[in-house]
Amino acid sequence: MIARPRSVSYDFAVLRAVPHPYIGAFVPVGVVLHARTADYLGMRAITDIDELRAQVPEIDAELLARYLRSVRAICDGDESAGPVALTPPSERFHWLTAPRSDVIQTSPIHEGVCFDPERELDVLFRTYVRRGSG
């Protein structure tokens, strides 16, 4: 008998750069994915300063890149990111996706099922952030 790969449910949110938080217009710049049963929390984001500057010219690209690095550090559980980075992955995901009035906000949380959370994160990043740019 051939073993079938086990599917995993996940939640994800799109990271959005919001030049003017009170207006609400945004540009997708990353994705964060949490698969609780796989103990997975990952993030993909635009990291190139020139690309960030081109995508979101109204925001200081250096500042935006610094914020995105902070999100990555929290996802990775890097202790230099502060106490929230030391919490379990599910708490970090919910902290990252909590509503806030800031230059980086998240979309509503969506759910899905996959076999490989890392690969699914790449697919979501291409779908919602790259959208045909490679």
For the regions a language model picked out, list residue spans one by one.
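Polybasic/polar functional segments that serve as interface/processing modules
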Residues: M1-G134
